[in-house]
Design a protein with these regions (language model features):
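N-terminal single-pass transmembrane signal-anchor helix
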Residues: 12-38
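Short, surface-exposed interaction loops/tails
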Residues: 82-85, 90-95, 101-102, 117-120, ...
């Protein structure tokens, strides 16, 4: 009988219950340590994508403004990216009036450069479908002098002031958007 028992032990292939419990415990510890880091990484990549999308729209507006074909008016162009409402680019003319002819030109220029289905109106472009919404809903709203007027809540945006001489200044909201620390 002892010979039969010893022979079975030699032929036994596999893991014991204790070994399996130890492996499961090690995996649980690793998941517990790495899961928070993974979620931080995912959120950071979402914010990076949002900042990149906003910067791309700002660059395209600069391209359109520098091309005499599109007759970009002097005024303030406000870009707002929202988690729920998509993206809107709005022109507020310095004189308070918006010329339909030149508005049609800059909206046509922006529509031709930006991908997606943009809806054009007299003084704005908008995209409300899921193509260009914020990926992250954890942005901290800017307050005080740092805020762009129409950027509220967890939205991000930029205000581009085009002077009569064509010079452009850009203000981001929140201001930490440019440095990626928000």
């Amino acid at each position: 009988m002892l010979k039969l028992f010893n022979r079975k032990k030699k032929d036994n292939k596999g893991f014991t219950l204790v070994e399996l419990v130890i492996v499961v415990a090690i995996l649980a510890i690793l998941v517990g340590l790495l899961a928070p880091q993974y979620t931080k990484y995912v959120e950071k990549s979402r914010k990076s994508a949002d900042a990149s999308n906003l910067e791309e729209i700002v660059k395209e507006l600069k391209v359109v403004a520098s091309d005499p074909q599109y007759s970009v008016q002097a005024g303030t162009y406000t870009i707002v990216m929202s988690h729920t409402n998509g993206t809107t680019i709005t022109l507020t003319n310095a004189s308070g009036t918006v010329s339909t002819t030149t508005t049609d030109l800059w909206t046509a220029g922006m529509s031709s450069l930006l991908e997606g289905n943009w809806t054009t109106a007299t003084d704005n472009l908008s995209m409300s479908n899921s193509d260009l919404k914020l990926k992250s809903n954890k942005w901290v709203a800017a307050t005080g002098n740092d805020a762009v007027a129409t950027v509220t809540g967890n939205d991000i945006g930029a205000s581009i002031v085009v002077g009569a001489d064509g010079q452009m200044t850009v203000k981001y909201s929140p201001t930490t958007l440019k440095s990626g620390t928000n």
